[in-house]
Amino acid sequence: MDDILFFQTEGDVIHAHKKDDIYETKYKLYQLEEMLPGFFMRVSKSAILNTNHIYSITRNLTASSTVTFAGTHKQVFVSRYYYKPLISKLEEKRLHQ
């Protein structure tokens, strides 16, 4: 579970993305959200990411943001609704390290 970067919907299918692989999962995002450890976080209606693998967050002019992960070209979009909670979660993690 630790090596999963994010889960993302693609049509009716949910994919688990690792650095170099993609796997299909049978669960819906809302089910994953309830089952996953606390270092995973919903960041849009179509994505849940692993906060342990965030390399950078870039805020766009449209108020949405893009998260990149170290060692891969993969990225996830964060809706403006989830941006502040994500930043708060990362700050909290940083303070408890």
Describe the residue ranges of each PLM region.
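Charged phosphate-binding loop/patch that engages nucleotide di/tri-phosphates or the phosphate backbone
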Residues: 85-97
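Conserved binding/recognition cores within well-folded domains
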Residues: 1-78, 97
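Short, charged alpha-helical segments
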Residues: 77-81, 85
